[in-house]
Amino acid sequence: MKAAWPLLLCIALLPEPSSSLAQSEDLATKSQRAKEFMAEGKFAEAIPLYSELNHALPNNPGLLLNLGMALHMAGDERKSIPQLEAAVKLDPKLGPAWLFLGAARLQLGDALEAVEPLRAVLRLQPDHQEARLMLAGALLSLERNAEAAQEYRKLADLSPASSPAWYGLGRSYEALSIRAFHQLEKTAPESAYWLALVAEARLRQQQFTSAFYLYRRALENSPAMLGLHEAVAEIYRQTGHPDWASVEEEKERKLSPPDCHSHTFECDFQEGHFERVIAAATEANPEESYYWRSRAYNELALNAFARLGQMPPSAEQHEIKAHIYSSQKKYIEAAEEWRQALKFSPGDRQIREQLAISLKFSQDYGGALLLFQDLLRTDPESTQLNYLVGDTLLELQRVEEATPFLRQVVARDPKSQAAHKSLARAYLAAGKSADAIPHLKAALATDEDGSLHYELGRAYQAHGQLALARQMLSQYQEIHSKQEAEKQSLNQEMQITPPDER
């Protein structure tokens, strides 16, 4: 928002009523000087002048707007909001005041409160692209993904060359696809529909063995489900078994084709009528509905991202690549894409945070820490950033420095299991097993490999609570043994084997 200030100044620097300013040559001089400061980007210098003008001429919506705008552009969002609220109260048709009010609330992370001011701008000026982009972003951050998609779609129609519009549209559709998948997972976990979606995702990530295993399980559940044999054939082709692929293709051909006269999901999907699939899926049974909606939204997302890829280089293109690399756990490559994105948007906090996270996951803890600390300086109340700084310091074995940050996070958000886990690690590293115990207990629900049960058992031992120690260590053994058995079973099952004779 702030990067676009020259454009917005053209809208927002409204002339104050000449009759008022004519009362005093001094006020007119101050007004002119304040405008010059704003045009030069010297927002802090303009603030005292606009404050004096507002004191001399109270309840002037134009002056309130300009003071609020100067405060916003100088980075003082909290002080800008009352001025902008007063301006729109006096003049509800003052579009620029609504715009800056929405922008200020977004800067403070209050997306919910930003929505109505931005909608007010669009009621006054429906083709205002900056307002629509901010509104769409606010809705997406609130997980109101269908509404966000509508706004991004309108923006893409207004400006087909807008990279942010296509990127946002793709992200909205992607979120809708994921939501439909999670609804399917709740409704029918382990169903053929669910297995097929997970397998499709693994195949896109070139995890061929895992995808093969899941497609085979889906076929066991639903042998007549269209597309499964063809997907298995694709895995065979990708892994160097063209003869096996031919067998699976023949099995697919023997299945009864869909009756396309009745507009089946399969036919509409194959013909690229994804909106029709989504609309029709609302009338289907839940399993089928969630399956087809997830697939259709995913295709719409891919189409939007493909459109983005055809445009000149942009931050959004690098963000897409960074997310893909992250999903593949290629964090060094992801970090490089975030660096490239940052060249297009040097002040973008979200990009800087994502770069730091990628650096952390790639074990460049020193580089990550510098970025996290810099972000925290401008947002010291952020629970997320305090946690990331503390956890990164812990990875660097700077335990004494890490502990205060992690304590602060746990105090603010007692339900944060990640923070409890990190704080427990810090206490254990410092030899404070008694202090670690309550935090290990709070984080036990996240223990996938038994390590937290083991650490808690050791902490109980050190603290002399031997019965509890035996209980925790016994549970650790159970978890560990079960996990090893499952791992061995999966290793046997997850092999790319020849086609069944059936």
Identify the meaning behind each predicted range:
Residues 52-53, 86-87, 120-121, 154-155, ...:
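Canonical positions in the second alpha-helix
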Residues 39-40, 73-74, 107-108, 141-142, ...:
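Register position in tetratricopeptide repeats
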